[in-house]
Amino acid sequence: MTLAELLPSVGMTGEPALETGLWPLGTRLERGELLLGGVPATELAARFGTPCQVLDEGTVRARARAFREALPEAEVVFAGKALPCREVYRWVADEGLSLDVCSAGELAIARSVGFPAERVLLHGNVKTPEDLKAALGYGVGRVVVDSFDEIEQLGALAEGPQDVLVRVTPGVDPRTHRAVATGVEDQKFGFSLAGGDALEAVLRVVEQPSLRLVGLHCHVGSQVRHVAVYEEAARRVVGLIASCGVRIEQLDLGGGFAVPYLPGEGEFDLGGFAHRVRVALSHECALRRVPVPRLSIEPGRAVVARAGVTLYRVAAVKRGVRRVFVAVDGGMSDNPRPALYGSRYAVRLVRRGGRRAPVTVVGRHCEAGDVLAEDVPLPEDVRAGDLLAVPVTGAYHHALASNYNAVGRPPVVGVRDGVARVLVRRETEEDLLRREV
């Protein structure tokens, strides 16, 4: 099979239609212009420079509501690590979501916008004393404990009954990239169910007078496409509930709901998930004669990924022996996911069509592995100065950005109803030097 057969748009002329399911809700083409939140992409690039991470507020809010509507009886917790940004935390708070944070830094962002403390969960396999003290000082609703050492430390620091959940490793294969498979045995997260550590952790929490066990937590992985994985995790954790002899009020199944990054990749079946997990939970609890706990879920990527689009300016085009390289003014400092996980993206040239051929889009950094997208169809006459748009960049882009090669991180620009505003400003050379002594 040829590349043209694999990528039907290769060789076509004219401007391609927007790929279904990849762009923010309401994105449209108007007289050749790509409109994001009603704002032309060319205007965004001119006003805010490139690279520029654009975030559509309406899409974030709509995705948050979709989870609440699918599971109205459950607690929906936004995984704050996906996009730690004050405005995003405000938006999800407005939509009734709770928030999980993994550090005193993420908690500081939540505090700065007055996020209700009772709706905050503290996560992480390592929580420093500073993290725990910050959480206790703010009065976070729950702490998800992840090690025996942490149970002792938290028990010693907490002055009153602090609600906790025990993170369980259910031993379920999520069928995803090994770097984000967190529910399998023999890895750093949680207490092993099969090895007996999970039951021991429950008993140790109960023994701590300053801690109150309210629930169990598990997270099977990221980019999980199969609902059956969550069903099996729920069944296994209910088995622990039945054996521990302690009333468990909450069962948090974590997040990891897959989103499409490329044309043709399907959406996660949220409706099917809601129905099948309810049935599995009810059936297993009835079978084991334990009360059905309240369900919690923690979508992060599934709330913000599609809301994001990154704009890059083409800096150079090089024609190699076998490939055409299109080099842009960003790269692995604003998107390390291709280097970390082999992630793939679609790319669009803004405001110009033409006959297309496969190219490799590469970044500006001093690494051969700084590749943003391979074998993507772009117009054959792509040239320096062109504007490229990459969709599905709302999750783990701003969060994972670095200063490699002392390059400042790009801004995050929010768009809604034809209005654009800076949510996080571009990092400057002065910012980079400020920490030097």
From Swiss-Prot:
It holds the Pfam family Orn_DAP_Arg_deC. SUPFAM superfamilies: Alanine racemase C-terminal domain-like (SSF50621), PLP-binding barrel (SSF51419). The keyword Lyase applies. The modification N6-(pyridoxal phosphate)lysine is found at residue 81. Its EC number is 4.1.1.20. The keyword Amino-acid biosynthesis applies. One of its GO terms (biological process) is lysine biosynthetic process via diaminopimelate. Pyridoxal 5'-phosphate binds at residues 256, 298-301, 396. One of its GO terms (molecular function) is pyridoxal phosphate binding. The active site is at 366 (proton donor). It catalyses: meso-2,6-diaminopimelate + H(+) = L-lysine + CO2. It comes from the Bacteria. Substrate binds at residues 301, 337, 341, 367, 396. Gene3D superfamilies: Alanine racemase, Lyase, Ornithine Decarboxylase, Chain A, domain 1. Its cofactor is pyridoxal 5'-phosphate. Pathway: Amino-acid biosynthesis; L-lysine biosynthesis via DAP pathway; L-lysine from DL-2,6-diaminopimelate: step 1/1. Keywords: Amino-acid biosynthesis, Decarboxylase, Lyase, Lysine biosynthesis, Pyridoxal phosphate. Specifically catalyzes the decarboxylation of meso-diaminopimelate (meso-DAP) to L-lysine. Belongs to the Orn/Lys/Arg decarboxylase class-II family. LysA subfamily. Homodimer. This is Diaminopimelate decarboxylase.
